[in-house]
Amino acid sequence: MGKSESQMDITDINTPKPKKKQRWTPLEISLSVLVLLLTIIAVTMIALYATYDDGICKSSDCIKSAARLIQNMDATAEPCTDFFKYACGGWLKRNVIPETSSRYGNFDILRDELEVVLKDVLQEPKTEDIVAVQKAKTLYRSCINESAIDSRGGEPLLKLLPDVYGWPVATENWEQKYGASWTAEKAIAQLNSKYGKKVLINLFVGTDDKNSVNHVIHIDQPRLGLPSRDYYECTGIYKEACTAYVDFMISVARLIRQEERLPIDENQLALEMNKVMELEKEIANATAKPEDRNDPMLLYKKMTLAQIQNNFSLEINGKPFSWLNFTNEIMSTVNISITNEEDVVVYAPEYLTKLKPILTKYSARDLQNLMSWRFIMDLVSSLSRTYKESRNAFRKALYGTTSETATWRRCANYVNGNMENAVGRLYVEAAFAGESKHVVEDLIAQIREVFIQTLDDLTWMDAETKKRAEEKALAIKERIGYPDDIVSNDNKLNNEYLELNYKEDEYFENIIQNLKFSQSKQLKKLREKVDKDEWISGAAVVNAFYSSGRNQIVFPAGILQPPFFSAQQSNSLNYGGIGMVIGHEITHGFDDNGRNFNKDGDLVDWWTQQSASNFKEQSQCMVYQYGNFSWDLAGGQHLNGINTLGENIADNGGLGQAYRAYQNYIKKNGEEKLLPGLDLNHKQLFFLNFAQVWCGTYRPEYAVNSIKTDVHSPGNFRIIGTLQNSAEFSEAFHCRKNSYMNPEKKCRVW
């Protein structure tokens, strides 16, 4: 650059000779003083401005957090009248449920984003991939290979059906082909042992609740083809689902007969599939309601196989059913021999008693039609487009969706569900900030400490039970992010999937291979000890978990992200996000189910009679509170306060513990800077971030479904119910007494 004029002036060489110095005039003196004063004022103002702190955080992370909160909320709504609208009104205006989704919320958006990461890491093979990762990528490619899947039609399924005694409605001369060799023991066992499909009788190997280091055989009622036993009323809001279900059966039977070039008698198809529906209705009515199955002490009934034979004799196809033969048909596939002295835990004795008269009314053909159908219906979406489309009306009736999930999304989820450690490794390497592990460890320690301190406040619990509750809380083991082995131990990861070998053009066979592998692995556990260090979740999951049998809490890498957590966001948001989730999972150890298990994970009554009675009384308050919520999206049905009790107790306890932990943080570290653009303090931001986790909505069909099947209250009621019980919330938002969000009667368990 050239010199400035001032520089040129200063450095002019031809400087004139100075004149004789003169006195300053009064005006010059006055002006000089004024200039000096103005200079001092200017310098002071600049210094003050440079050091002035307006208490607002202006970092990019604070700006992002504030923008997210502002976008989601409706500041014109009254927080003390409807905090769901206040916290989520903006979100509801900006978002529409995608055609492929049955519900849509902030949780679902996080899951959608995680699926994008999975797609990116699964679709590109790399030369440095270890064998386990190569297999995961092959499985993914086989799943998205729609041209190969479509070209095969229903052929892969047709080849498999003879292995499960066929499907009578889609088989010519079934009685001649299979009838003579058919036995109930073999037919029911074959689906279970090979493919993990439990129809009519649900036999599985799981942890022994009363001795949680051991595995034991369990016998329980089966799952149903429709979402819950209520659907089988087939009237009112359930009528469309029942019609679509039978039509779905008929459509698939027709497709198979067409592909097999067999004659099609529409009347016969309708007759047989309606018979299947009649049978399944009777089975549904024999099952116990969920609210009658929520006490693990009452559910647990251990007996020998010989006692089962005596207590629950069945007659099928005119022959007595041998429980010993049935169990051996299953366990022999993993070379385990069973005698009549084998211990079995029966979860559903009433169901088995009611099953007896039902089974005598139906032929082997009827029973096999149901069993094969229940197997087939799970596999239809793995076949060609024609088969997939036969499910459209059924999917719409249950979920309200008019389009299938994008193939790549479905496939990313499928691979993650079947190879969670291989996929977890890829996800962690691509997207997980490892330093967050230590921060979350510290948060867990703080919230656990608050839980223990809070025990002193509980007037309904005696000292003896408090002491045992403290011991259990201290014994809770935490798992954060991911198991180190999945990243550091290549051999262990490769060995986990050693038996699996996928082909890129055989997606259906790959699925069958996974079913067999998974079921065999589970059955083999019968003679093995429970590995209590095993993680109960993969890493690439947006969720958190508590295991009563392990007394373990798990926070996978997938949930350790905003709005739940970020090392860079305000602590009020972290405590209202992941802090509440931590408190929620800890409290699960003391909800209506978890409280029945001791610090070692065993089903043991460690409560005094008085404390147990008081717990039930305290809980009843929440049963009534949530049971009084009416959900417009589910046709005005009321929530089930009994089925959702455990989650509601955990929500309320978790929020209270996280808030007290945040107050402790402020006492120790001082107030945080406020967020820009929000006229809210950090106590208010704590509650706002908690609420915004649950922003979302449902399709009416899925609302009807989830109100009967989901143990969680819908998101809006998780916000309202929990905050109605929080005096700290009402104090933070200055809610007058008896406003909707600040009722006089408040429920508290923990």
From Swiss-Prot:
Bilayer topology term: Single-pass type II membrane protein
Top-level lineage group: Eukaryota
Compositionally skewed regions (Polar residues) per UniProt: 1-14
Native organism: Pongo abelii (Sumatran orangutan)
GO function terms (MF aspect): cardiolipin binding; metallocarboxypeptidase activity; metalloendopeptidase activity; peptide binding; phosphatidylserine binding; protein homodimerization activity; zinc ion binding
Keywords: Cell membrane, Disulfide bond, Glycoprotein, Hydrolase, Lipoprotein, Membrane, Metal-binding, Metalloprotease, Myristate, Phosphoprotein, Protease, Signal-anchor, Transmembrane, Transmembrane helix, Zinc
Transmembrane segments: 29-51
Name of the protein in question: Neprilysin
Classification of source organism: Eukaryota, Metazoa, Chordata, Craniata, Vertebrata
Disulfide-bond pairs as recorded: C57-C62, C80-C735, C88-C695, C143-C411, C234-C242, C621-C747
